[in-house]
């Protein structure tokens, strides 16, 4: 059966470069090494940034900051799909605006008078010698929202978070003890709306393959990996029908053995696959 969710045209993720150029991704905290967690500038470099001309800023970004990125995140170059994936994402400096790409599917389920709560998830890509893996979690059964379901690390954007990127990093640290030096964000996918009333912005990132998950016992029952190649293949993704709030509805689901990867998690992966297909 051909359903509308499989024929969605996603908006372009390309964003015109801002002027003046800035590496700031609004995750602003000076770490122990004297560098900002988000942009890898020193405090002095941040303070004098407004006094630099456009050429000086771009040179600093393309040389000094690029070298620091390679030094801090040495595992980045191990991701063979890095250039391909980065090219289809919204840049970190420009989180996607607007409604979720699946709004039309949920018009009769979402509150029209209330604003949706902002949330973020981390779509973690782990470069392994055997191929890139996608890091997933299974939530504990006792959680209020989506208990027992397979999901990405993430949650609601809190007041003190530095936007959706800050929320995704914080939640990943809280849920599975993913440290700042073990994750290198690449960019954003399109926002996705959930029946529980959240506008979810997926943050795609590379995770250090030496990272060892430590799941929070109150939130995460299990952490596991699935091959990226499997999840990006149309062969393994299907639509299933289910009864929900009075009518038959269609949801996406993977045929992965041992875990049910479906719903919002499957839809976010589908969004990434479609974007990659558009530039293939």
Predicted regions and their residues:
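Short, intrinsically disordered, charge-biased short linear motifs at domain edges
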Residues: 10-15, 21-29
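NUDIX/MutT-family hydrolases
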Residues: 215-257
């Amino acid at each position: 059966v051909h359903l509308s969710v499989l024929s969605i045209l996603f908006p372009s993720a390309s964003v015109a470069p801002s002027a003046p150029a800035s590496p700031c991704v609004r995750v602003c905290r000076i770490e122990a090494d004297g560098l900002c967690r988000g942009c890898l500038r020193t405090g002095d470099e941040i303070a004098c940034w407004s006094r630099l001309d456009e050429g000086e800023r771009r040179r600093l970004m393309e040389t000094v900051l690029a070298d620091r990125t390679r030094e801090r995140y040495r595992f980045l170059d191990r991701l063979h799909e890095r250039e391909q994936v980065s090219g289809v994402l919204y840049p970190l400096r420009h989180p996607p605006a607007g409604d979720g790409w699946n709004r039309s599917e949920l018009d009769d389920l979402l509150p029209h008078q209330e604003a949706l709560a902002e949330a973020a998830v981390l779509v973690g890509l782990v470069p392994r010698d055997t191929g890139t893996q996608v890091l997933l979690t299974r939530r504990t059964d006792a959680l209020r929202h989506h208990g027992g379901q397979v999901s990405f690390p993430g949650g609601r954007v809190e007041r003190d978070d530095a936007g959706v990127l800050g929320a995704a990093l914080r939640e990943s640290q809280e849920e599975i003890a993913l440290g700042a030096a073990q994750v290198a964000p690449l960019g954003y996918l399109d926002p996705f709306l959930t029946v529980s009333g959240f506008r979810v912005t997926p943050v795609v990132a590379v995770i250090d393959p030496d990272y060892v998950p430590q799941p929070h016992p109150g939130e995460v029952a299990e952490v596991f990996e699935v091959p990226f190649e499997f999840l990006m293949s149309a062969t393994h993704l299907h639509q299933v029908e289910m009864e929900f709030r009075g009518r038959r509805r269609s949801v996406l689901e993977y045929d992965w053995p041992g875990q049910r990867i479906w719903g919002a998690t499957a839809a976010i992966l589908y969004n990434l696959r479609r974007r990659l297909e558009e530039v293939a």
